[in-house]
């Protein structure tokens, strides 16, 4: 029994080397597992409209998490919560979770969330806000579970579908599109009415004429 337990733990904590695409626009799977959700959703951690890909891990999958994109960590948010079955929709909002938001070199924001599950009771995160991470770099671990949600920009093209199996860093789950630039605010051009030379000179000429026509007694007064 001891050896069986030892083999199970050794397999669970394994972290095999993987081949990864060199496509800079590729978003790689952060974990081994099965896609259970592909939909548009408002990311609760950035407030942006996004495309969501959820990947569920069973106890036999590799549970090391890898960064799906390269960039700088903008924020990390940890939430205490319940330990519901991670395949349930409400697990995204109610379970213990850790959300990391990364901004890519071209300014695109990608958020990925470690979610604990029914068996998993421990989320580990090895990175800090401000760290610059490479794509496919190990950043965390969920012991004995569970699920990772990836929130992508709306311009991204999702390449996986519900029910599809993923292999961490080997499976490309999406490709980032071109970054959407905010509209440039143009200052309104203000046209100043200058008028003709004659119109500009008229007030000055009128003032001179008034001074000449003034009577001596008026000046004396």
Region locations from a protein language model:
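Contiguous, well-folded functional domains in the mature portion of proteins
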Residues: 1-198, 203-204, 217-221
